Structures are given as C-alpha cells and as structure tokens.
Amino acid sequence: VLSDTVFAYVSDTKTPQGVMCVVRQRNKTAKKWERLIEKEQQKPFFLVLDNLQDPGNMGTVIRTAEAAGVTGILMSADCVDVYNPKTIRSTMGSVYRMPLWYAEDICEAVRELKRQGIHTYAAHLEGTVVYDEAEYREGTAFLIGNEGNGLRQEVAELADTWVRIPMAGHVESLNAAI
C-alpha cells in the first residue's frame, strides 16, 4: 500500500485510478514470429508498422488489430515503445494478448513474410488499388508507415500491392491508426 504522495510520484497521470503493478516485459525481438506463421491453420494476417511514433496511435492500432483478428504485429526497431504508459492505457489490455515483435531490419522481415507466402499490401497515398477492391485470398500483411511521412520508400517498394483509401474533401491522409 502506497501513500497518496508516493502514488502520485510514481504515477504518470494526474488522476490515477489507484491501482498499480510491476511486471516483467516480454522479449519482443523478431526471432520467434516466423513460428506463428507455421502454427496458423488459416491465412495469417499481419500488420507491419514502420516507425510509428505516437503512443496513442500505437495503442489504438494494437487494440483495433486484436478486434479485427490480426495474427500478430511486426514493428520496426524505431517504433514507439509498446510499454509506454499511454500506449498501454489506450490498448485497454490488448497489449498483453496481441503477439508483438520488434524487427531490427524491417525490410528483411517483410522479405521473410513474402518468402513464407504472405502477400504484402502497402498503405500508400499513391496506391493503385482501392483497399476494399483488393482480393485477400492468401496470407496477408498490411504495411503501415509513420504518422507524418508514411512508409519509408525502401519498405514500400517491397510490397506486392500498394493500396489506398479514397478520401473526399480536402483530406490528404488519415491517421496511421485508421
């Protein structure tokens, strides 16, 4: 039991809920994610995140991915820490259930997905295929880029297909979490 003063000191929010725990972080390096492809009886469905920086966006992506049935999320080494307090809060617990890995070399990770028969789709402003017109008949990986800059060119060029979300009005792009 902590005093209010100590609890306020160790908490990162102004109005904490009064519950806190200390846990050991899982090793989230990409060495084990290939095994998940082999275990999948159906078509695996991955997200590949390139340099996401906003903790709230990362949390929303993780939570939405769990709800959508994503098999796992592969992240570039320069993505925001999934154990950032804001990320954890915004996942509403999904961070503890969703398989997550950091890849030291995201390009090599995408190449490995492709070697495993996974079709890769880059979310890209110059996409030639509208996202809901693509045929998702095999294992799938969506490549999603940084909030301000999108996918790095070297990552985008590895994708089998570039997809886009058509937008009305004067909107140029959507939040990475969408």
Language-model regions: role of each:
Residues 13, 85-87, 132-135:
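Short secondary-structure transition/capping segments
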Residues 1, 5, 22, 28, ...:
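RNA substrate-binding interface of SAM-dependent RNA methyltransferases
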Residues 1-15:
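Phosphate/diphosphate ligand-binding glycine-rich loop within oxidoreductases
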Residues 10, 109-112, 173-177:
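Short, charged, surface-exposed secondary-structure boundary motifs
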Residues 14-18, 42-44, 137:
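Short connector loops at helix/strand junctions that flank enzyme active sites
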Residues 13-17, 113-117, 178:
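Short, surface-exposed amphipathic charged segments that create phosphate/polyanion-binding patches used
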Residues 18-21, 64-68, 82, 87-95, ...:
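Structured adenosyl-cofactor binding patch, chiefly the S-adenosyl-L-methionine
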Residues 121-171:
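Active-site/ligand-binding-proximal alpha/beta "capping" segment
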